[in-house]
């Protein structure tokens, strides 16, 4: 069994019980790459960006118990950096991190349906210099977003817009960024065993948030700030989180949100 993990601080509590020799093969991937691997059939389970799971749900099912990465009101690591508020980015160019899968779709959805801004989305790979000089905004996620938030000048940007805050203001529901999913074709016993193993590892990680934060303190922020960051996440998905996930899926369909490359055509 090959399991993909996301190498971000917000996912670290899931891995606390894995040790150096977990009972499965592991690979570390950014969210977008993990989604590609799931589609190609090269992984059996992973912490999958929820937008990718929407695409792959015929082949992957949520593990039991349902686990993921969700937040209410704010997240601090899915940030649109800009010099204007989002509603004033109409006709402007905004770069999107190469790592993102769910957050770039959330940004597109917010732009179309909430901010009412026609934004030109630019893949990060097209940037050649300082983003603050080339584009009007930059969407970052995960540890890169945390690092820029911890920087005194925020990379030269004047404004930071937390996409979880925008979603909460609009829909008053938690936002689920990623879910643990396992290939449906695996034997039922193997799927159940993995779900139990992961749940137990998370239980251990949840008891060690202070030490996890201390281990990562530095460029991402101080230990106290990072512990508060970790404690804000919901990792065991309940009815509100699942409702938020369904609402996101429905809104993506309603507004015909596609890959940002397609949206530029």
Enumerate the language-model features and the residues they cover:
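Secondary-structure end/capping motifs
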Residues: 186-251, 255
């Amino acid at each position: 069994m090959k399991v993909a993990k996301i190498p971000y601080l917000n996912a670290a509590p899931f891995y606390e019980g894995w040790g150096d020799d977990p009972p499965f093969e592991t690979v570390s991937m950014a969210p977008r790459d993990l989604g590609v691997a799931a589609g190609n059939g090269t992984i059996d389970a992973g912490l999958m960006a929820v937008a990718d799971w929407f695409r792959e749900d015929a082949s992957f099912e949520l593990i039991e118990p349902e686990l993921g990465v969700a937040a209410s009101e704010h997240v601090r690591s899915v940030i649109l950096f800009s010099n204007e508020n989002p509603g004033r980015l109409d006709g402007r160019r905004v770069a999107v991190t190469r790592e993102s899968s769910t957050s770039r779709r959330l940004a597109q959805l917010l732009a179309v349906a909430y901010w009412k801004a026609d934004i030109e989305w630019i893949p990060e790979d097209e940037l050649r210099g300082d983003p603050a000089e080339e584009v009007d905004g930059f969407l970052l996620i995960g540890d890169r977003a945390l690092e820029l938030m911890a920087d005194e000048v925020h990379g030269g940007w004047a404004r930071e817009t937390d996409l979880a805050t925008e979603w909460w203001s609009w829909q008053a529901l938690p936002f689920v960024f990623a879910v643990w999913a396992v290939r449906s074709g695996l034997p039922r016993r193997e799927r159940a065993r993995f779900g139990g193993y992961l749940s137990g590892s998370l239980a251990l990680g949840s008891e060690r948030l202070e030490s996890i934060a201390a281990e990562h303190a530095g460029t991402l922020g101080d230990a106290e700030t990072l512990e508060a960051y970790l404690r804000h996440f919901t990792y065991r998905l309940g009815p509100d989180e699942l409702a938020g996930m369904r609402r996101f899926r429905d809104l993506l369909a309603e507004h015909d949100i596609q890959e940002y490359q397609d949206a530029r055509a």
